[in-house]
UniProtKB/Swiss-Prot annotation:
<feature type="region of interest" description="Disordered">
    <location>
        <begin position="297"/>
        <end position="321"/>
    </location>
</feature>
<dbReference type="GO" id="GO:0005634">
    <property type="term" value="C:nucleus"/>
</dbReference>
<keyword id="KW-0805">Transcription regulation</keyword>
<feature type="region of interest" description="Disordered">
    <location>
        <begin position="362"/>
        <end position="383"/>
    </location>
</feature>
<dbReference type="GO" id="GO:0003677">
    <property type="term" value="F:DNA binding"/>
</dbReference>
<keyword id="KW-0539">Nucleus</keyword>
<protein>
    <recommendedName>
        <fullName>Pyrichalasin H cluster regulator BC2</fullName>
    </recommendedName>
</protein>
<feature type="compositionally biased region" description="Polar residues">
    <location>
        <begin position="298"/>
        <end position="309"/>
    </location>
</feature>
<feature type="compositionally biased region" description="Basic and acidic residues">
    <location>
        <begin position="362"/>
        <end position="380"/>
    </location>
</feature>
<keyword id="KW-0479">Metal-binding</keyword>
<keyword id="KW-0804">Transcription</keyword>
<keyword id="KW-0238">DNA-binding</keyword>
<comment type="function">
    <text>Transcription factor probably involved in regulation of gene cluster that mediates the biosynthesis of a tyrosine-derived cytochalasan acting as a fungal signal recognized by resistant rice plants and leads to avirulence in Pi33 resistant rice cultivars.</text>
</comment>
<dbReference type="GO" id="GO:0046872">
    <property type="term" value="F:metal ion binding"/>
</dbReference>
<keyword id="KW-0862">Zinc</keyword>
Amino acid sequence: MEDIGKAGFFSDKSIGTGENTPLLDSYTFDFDSGPYGGAHYTITGVPDMSTGFSTFAGTGLSATEMGYCYPFGVDPSSRGDGSIHPPKCRYEKSIMQVHPESGDLGMQGATLFPSSPTSLESVRKRALDLHCFLFTQLHCVTDEDLAEAILSPFIFSESVKEPTGPRANIIQRLIYASECLLGLISTLSFLWTGCEDSGNSPPASMANQQGPQFQFPSRTQHKSNSVLAQHLLGLAGRSLHLEDSANFTGRQHTASPSETSVVDLPTITTILTCHVGILSVYRYTFSRIHDALRACGSSPSGTPESELTSPHKRATTCSPLPNKDTLPLNMPFVLGLRVQLEIMTHMLDRMRAAWATAMEDHPGHEDHQQQQEEVKQHDRLSHHKRATLATLKSMLALNGHELSNQDGGTGIGAVGDLGDRVRRLLRNCDKGMY
């Protein structure tokens, strides 16, 4: 066990309550010195752990040796027989694919990342795709899913190529959804300003978000910029063909530049829904891992069972000390858990930074006239920011999330604190052996 510490595998073995030190402090880990049933393996990571999730190659480790601890699916009564079973990989798991252009579900080679310049249509499309992905692929997390994800760095290194493919585990899908959310958060300023920036202006048919501006001229002019108004005045140049349209509901009308064809849909609210949903998945994942680690050790004496099962109490109750009578945690499982904790923690940090960037104020110009325009635009922008944060706080509270002043009311701080508790409890449960 001492060889592992000499390899610099962990940056800190302390069990403090306030530090946030990484469990992994380098990108390459040589871990072939431990006598774990003759298993020798090398783990190699990549610098950006958020996008390089599960790009870890394991060698020389059999499936039997890669068993996982019993709270994640193995009957504790079977621990004494010496047999440990790896989690099942469900190749038949149905994963939704979203084609970047057609929007059809079930297409292979999908991506939720933007493939074109920012426009209202592209942002709506990405928000819709992420919303659908969240509610169809991340709505259910089982202990078996988590056990599979924690050991996946040693089993399926090729799954990183298709984070939404059939071999993608629950954490890969969560990280993928988080990356998509980062892209949507970066578009908030674009949505707040109502596309007033000419450099990011959408097509002419999408330009007006404020609703139709009907102008009814006098009858002597016989002109109107509104096609509907022309029909109301009986001045339209063509009939509506009501019989044909009644029988064929799939007809699409191509808007002319003078028409208002875009409804002001709640795109920002959809993005906020995705944010709250993704945070809920992080919170549930951390809670399930925390409960499993607690089952490996012992609960604090005198702590009611209701406090251990409450998400609020889970985030505030002190970590228990390990029970000397319990078996040590399975080493590959501890290693995989530390890797996945670092990945998820890093992604939460990126989400926090993305929100900070979206909410920051930009310096003004020296030109007086331009300053006046910027003051007006700044007032509108500040109003939209305050309204967005107020809505987000309400949605977080409605879903049982804790709010912290440190994260600006985005709910990331409380979820990150729960992740830190898992890290500290892991240090307790492994008894400093790893």
